[in-house]
């Protein structure tokens, strides 16, 4: 008799995605981050749901409701810190996932890649709005500064900002709508994840060698289910260590001060995972130019498939491109550091140099190096 998982309409979908899915035998642990991201999303939705039961999205009570969750709700503190630090784990996994896609040429599956870019924007928007909800000083001023960037859009900018704010400043209406969107977006992200997987399973997974792996496949279960479970356990262990030993390590102390529109903090900065983009924004003295650079720093991922000039798909056998890739990683770490520093010498010039280098590596150095490697292959 045929197994029910292969005949039942619903189980068949699960079976084809998680059990009998053929996977290249050479995929390494860098391919684990998709499942880690799914685990992160599940943790965020679950903890967020329970936090939303106790949170109030009103400027008068938002800060106190978060304090109430931490002090009075059973295990509320662990829910709050799991959610806050879970976002950090989410972005660590997300950036490694994108980095793996760049290194191993996964962007050649353009539909999957483009949905991935949409997902990245959606997760960033969700995280930004979530940071506003505790209504501390950095929440309020972060929301004010970042939403104000839209005023750089010619003609409609000012009206657009006031429309988003629901008034003439970040206030009660802003907080309420941000909470509504912050609750809604993760479910949209979950739907996009399904589309992302749908496109991925049309082509099958890429592999470290970059050559077709049709003759050499293994079933997803048990090999990759065990591998993914191990990865998830390691990630949850790291998250637990962070939550239980130093929950405020990645947060800003200013966010423990209730929002005060009359008192501007000396250094307004977003969470660590946005600092690289914030540094690029600040490195351009012109407001509109800065906003364009900020958007392009992520949107540039969309044109990477067009800039692929190499005859080989992955960087596995391309040492010059590997050097450039790790230079890009170092540059992003430099930008992250600069984003957290005050706007003064020498940080300004370092930020500007790192910002120029970021775009130069992607737009110029990588395609040229790939073309040069093609030429060297003829020798």
Swiss-Prot record:
Note: Heme 1 (or BL or b562) is low-potential and absorbs at about 562 nm, and heme 2 (or BH or b566) is high-potential and absorbs at about 566 nm.
Cofactor: heme b
Protein name stated in the entry: Cytochrome b
PANTHER family in alphabetical order: CYTOCHROME B
Binding site for heme b b562: 83, 182
Family indicated by similarity: Belongs to the cytochrome b family.
Keyword Electron transport among UniProt keywords: yes
Function per UniProt: Component of the ubiquinol-cytochrome c reductase complex (complex III or cytochrome b-c1 complex) that is part of the mitochondrial respiratory chain. The b-c1 complex mediates electron transfer from ubiquinol to cytochrome c. Contributes to the generation of a proton gradient across the mitochondrial membrane that is then used for ATP synthesis.
Organism: Pteronotus personatus
Gene3D superfamilies: Cytochrome Bc1 Complex, Chain C
Cellular component aspect of the GO annotation: mitochondrial inner membrane; respiratory chain complex III
């Amino acid at each position: 008799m045929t197994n029910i998982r292969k005949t039942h309409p619903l189980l068949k979908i699960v079976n084809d995605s998680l059990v009998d899915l053929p996977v290249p035998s050479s995929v390494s642990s860098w391919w684990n981050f998709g499942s880690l991201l799914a685990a992160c999303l599940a943790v965020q939705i679950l903890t967020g749901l329970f936090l939303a039961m106790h949170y109030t999205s009103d400027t008068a009570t938002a800060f106190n409701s978060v304090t109430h969750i931490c002090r009075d709700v059973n295990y509320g503190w662990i829910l709050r810190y799991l959610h806050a630090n879970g976002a950090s784990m989410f972005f660590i996994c997300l950036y490694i996932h994108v980095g793996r896609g760049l290194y191993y040429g996964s962007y050649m599956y353009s539909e999957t890649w483009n949905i991935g870019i949409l997902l990245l924007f959606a997760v960033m928007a969700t995280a930004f709005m979530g940071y506003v909800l505790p209504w501390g000083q950095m929440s309020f001023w972060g929301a004010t500064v970042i939403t104000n960037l839209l005023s750089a859009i010619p003609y409609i900018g000012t009206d657009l900002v006031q429309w988003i704010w629901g008034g003439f400043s970040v206030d009660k209406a802003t907080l309420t709508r941000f909470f509504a969107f912050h609750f809604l977006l993760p479910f949209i992200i979950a739907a996009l994840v399904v589309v992302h997987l749908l496109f991925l399973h049309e082509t099958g997974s890429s592999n470290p060698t970059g050559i077709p792996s049709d003759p050499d496949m293994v079933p997803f279960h048990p090999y990759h289910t065990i591998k993914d479970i191990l990865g998830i356990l390691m990630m949850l262990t790291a998250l637990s260590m962070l939550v239980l030993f130093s929950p405020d390590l990645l947060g800003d102390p200013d966010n423990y001060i209730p929002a005060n529109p009359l008192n501007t903090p000396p250094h307004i900065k977003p969470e660590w995972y946005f600092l690289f983009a914030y540094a690029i924004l600040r490195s351009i003295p012109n407001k509109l130019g800065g906003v364009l650079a900020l958007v392009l720093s992520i949107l540039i991922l969309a044109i990477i498939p067009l800039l692929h000039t190499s005859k080989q798909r992955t960087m596995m056998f391309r040492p010059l491109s590997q050097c450039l890739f790790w230079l890009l990683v170092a540059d992003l770490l430099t930008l992250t550091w600069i984003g957290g520093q005050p706007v003064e010498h020498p940080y300004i010039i370092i930020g500007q140099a790192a910002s120029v280098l970021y775009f130069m590596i992607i737009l110029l150095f990588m395609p040229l190096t790939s073309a040069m490697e093609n030429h060297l292959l003829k020798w």
